[in-house]
Amino acid sequence: LCALLLLAAAQIREVPSTTALWAAPAILLAAMLIAWAAESAQFFVAQGFALAILAWLQTLPEFAVEFVLAWKQQVPLLLANLTGALRLLTGLGWPMIYAVAALASRARRRKPLKEIRLEEAHCVEVVGLLVPLIYITFVWAKASLNLIDAGVLILIYVAYLIVLRRMPPEQPEGIEDLELIPRSIVKAPRRTRNLVIVALFAAGGALIYLCAEPFLGSLLAISAALGVPSFVFVQWVAPFVSEFPEKVSAFYWARTIDRAPMALMNMVSSNINQWTLLAAMLPIVYSISRGAPSTIPFDQQQELEILMTLGQSLVGMLFLVNMKLAWWEASSLFSLWFIQFVFSPVKPGPGLLGFLAAHIHWYVTVAYLTWFALGLLRYVLGRRRMDAFHLFGEMWRRHIRPRPAPAVK
């Protein structure tokens, strides 16, 4: 927590664009170290719990950017960054995981990958994503974010971690499927193994802490040289850079095909992390900066941004309820994200492009919400399986709140 606060409190200094030449490889190395640690740790704690810790470490730079914007009371920019980061995760991250796994399947197995099938334990992440989305709907409806909301969102995340902590670790049979480094760690003596896992998490986190600011600063310099508007930078470039470590580790797993579900859950865990902890941090820092308990109000444009992001996450969650992500679902998420992304730098004005730029967010939002409503109707009518909820109920009875064995008479 102290490291996060120190990183977040630091101002993003101007650095030359060439800084990216050393900062980018350092971030890549950090992502690999943390990925190896999480891949090894899943055999001793629940995979979902390891991924939750991994997701938090990987998104430290995103927390830092949001901290600075909230401290400066830049409400339009901090909400733009939050919604941009979340839409990048679901609209670009999830489809890219499928794309990497599909390309690897074509290259290695000579056959197409029609879908990514989740493991049974992943039902916790799928159901865990729904809970904050329900509460965020209430936040959107009242058009503000306050300290009470922060408390509720933090409690939701704590409850999510408690559930994950009670899930069983991966079965030992999967150890031989690991690549050389994580497999060697898992097979090492207990004391050595634990020390190496902690050291990898710590080293990766430290590298992200030390390199995030210069990496972001170098991208800021490059964007300025290319004439990228500040709003576009804050909504798209900064989140992409701050989530870069996460994408590296997720794509590293996705290329193995068999670990594509783990890669996808890495992204879903980050969705939960940002809808809860990141959103909760904003009114806390904002209130401290103002010197009194304060509410972050939403204007009409910000309400639309939040609703569009909420709609996208709801559609993504709905896709995963049957415990798989099909090729057409990944393509749909990417297509809707790409449409509104392309029009982000276009200014509203006369002509067709100007008209579309002024209304595209509304059109995409309606598309998300309509898709969610129709998808929900299919589940209600029994035309699509709600496997995640059935499995979660089973996991709850088996691991979270197991029934005591009947007394022997």
Role assignments for model-derived ranges:
Residues 1-409:
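Hydrophobic alpha-helical segments, chiefly the membrane-spanning helices
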